[in-house]
Curated annotation (Swiss-Prot):
Keywords assigned: Chemotaxis, Hydrolase
Keyword Transcription found: no
Family: Belongs to the CheD family.
Organism field: Burkholderia pseudomallei (strain K96243)
Domain of life: Bacteria
Role, per record: Probably deamidates glutamine residues to glutamate on methyl-accepting chemotaxis receptors (MCPs), playing an important role in chemotaxis.
EC number(s) from the headed UniProt entry: 3.5.1.44
Disulfides per UniProt: none
Molecular function in Gene Ontology: protein-glutamine glutaminase activity
InterPro entries per the UniProt record, alphabetical: CheD-like_sf (IPR038592), Chemorcpt_Glu_NH3ase_CheD (IPR005659), Cytotoxic_necrot_fac-like_cat (IPR011324)
Family annotation (PANTHER family): CHEMORECEPTOR GLUTAMINE DEAMIDASE CHED-RELATED (PTHR35147:SF2)
GO-annotated biological processes: chemotaxis
Protein name: Probable chemoreceptor glutamine deamidase CheD
Length: 234
């Protein structure tokens, strides 16, 4: 695990009255501890996975769906991409004692936070990717808050699976700067859209369990705007 970009920004969260970890882009974190994992998202996506029986969970934060990268690429670079970030999170939870068949997912982000982003909507691509990846992996999404135009601050309690989300003002300076850099990266030198690559995932024969009727996602902070979208049962 030494080569993987595990989040290291530990702090005490005064709002939740517990220790926490702030995840930056390209990072992940897994734990059984009763703590809070926090990240801020624009077009990026965070997947929060939880084993309700093992009471273990984790979060990742990826910037682009997949680049079809060389497997020998550095782990810190590969974590930018959803396929690798999801694989790392799942595998690390299993190594720590989680059971894949019990995993539940809550997913956030994928906003279109830059005005005029009509030809390359990174947020839509990320949201579409994480839904397809989890469907192929037979991991149910119990709740989601994806797309739209607002950046988000997400808090996840990996011990209980509780998640909370806060919508931020559209042009949050740090998020806007990061989004501009992502937009440049998503376009090749000739100004054409980078090709989309299907995630390298495995299929499993066991049918996915149905999603819960109500997502365990709440709002926090004074500027919260709306709850996460409820997942409908098939």
């Amino acid at each position: 695990m030494s080569g993987l970009p595990i989040a290291t920004n530990l702090y005490f969260d005064a709002h939740f009255h517990r220790h926490g970890v702030k995840l930056l882009p390209n990072e992940f974190y897994t734990t059984r501890e009763d703590m809070v994992l926090v990240t801020v998202l624009g077009s990026c996506v965070a997947a929060c996975l939880h084993d309700p029986i093992g009471r273990i969970g984790g979060m990742n934060h990826f910037m682009l769906p997949d680049d079809g990268a060389d497997p020998s690429a550095a782990a810190s670079e590969s974590m930018r991409y959803g396929a690798y970030a999801m694989e790392v999170l799942i595998n690390e939870l299993i190594k720590a004692g989680g059971r894949r068949e019990r995993f539940e997912a809550k997913v956030f982000g994928g906003a279109a936070v830059l005005a005029g982003m009509t030809t390359i909507n990174i947020g839509d691509r990320n949201a579409d990717f994480v839904r397809r990846y989890l469907a192929l992996e037979r991991i149910r999404i119990t709740a989601e808050d994806l797309q739209g135009v607002h950046p988000r601050k997400v808090a996840f309690m990996p011990h209980t699976g509780q998640a909370m989300v806060k919508k931020l003002r559209v042009q949050a300076p740090d998020v806007a700067a990061r989004e501009a850099a992502l937009a440049r990266e998503a376009v090749d030198p000739h100004g054409e859209r980078a090709p989309r690559v299907r995630p390298r995932v495995e299929l499993f024969g066991t049918p996915a369990p149905k999603a819960q009727a109500k997502p365990r996602i709440e709002l926090f902070g004074m500027r919260a705007m709306q709850p996460a979208t409820r997942k409908q049962e098939a």
